Amino acid sequence: MKQSLAVKTFEDLFAELGERARTRPAGSATVAALDGGVHGLGKKILEEAGEVWLAAEHESDDALAGEISQLLYWTQVLMIARGLSLDDVYRKL
């Protein structure tokens, strides 16, 4: 029997990142990124977007999914840095 993997939803990730921003655990990469500010986060998002594009062109679906997950992570960190909620974004979909 194949063991199922726990799946983290977009909402779960946002809640987890928000908790890290509030509690500021030592050694957290999320906290360090938030402390680096919006400019650094924007640069990271551009980097990840490029990696998504390259993965779409040249890599497997699994590799592409991994790159997309990183883009979503950094986008959510930027949202938290700017004080946006998921609902702020959902209203624009």
Swiss-Prot record:
Q: What is the designated name of this protein?
A: Phosphoribosyl-ATP pyrophosphatase
Q: Which PANTHER family match?
A: HISTIDINE BIOSYNTHESIS BIFUNCTIONAL PROTEIN, HISTIDINE BIOSYNTHESIS BIFUNCTIONAL PROTEIN HIS7
Gene Ontology annotations for the cellular component aspect, listed alphabetically: cytoplasm
Tell me the route in metabolism or biology where this protein functions.
Amino-acid biosynthesis; L-histidine biosynthesis; L-histidine from 5-phospho-alpha-D-ribose 1-diphosphate: step 2/9
Family recorded in the similarity comment: Belongs to the PRA-PH family.
An individual GO BP term: L-histidine biosynthetic process
Q: Which organism is it from?
A: Mycobacterium avium (strain 104)
| UniProt-listed NCBIfam families | histidine_hisI, PRK00400.1-1
Pfam families per record: PRA-PH
Segments spanning the bilayer are: none
Tell me which domain of life the UniProt entry assigns to the organism this sequence originates from. Bacteria
**EC number of the protein:** 3.6.1.31
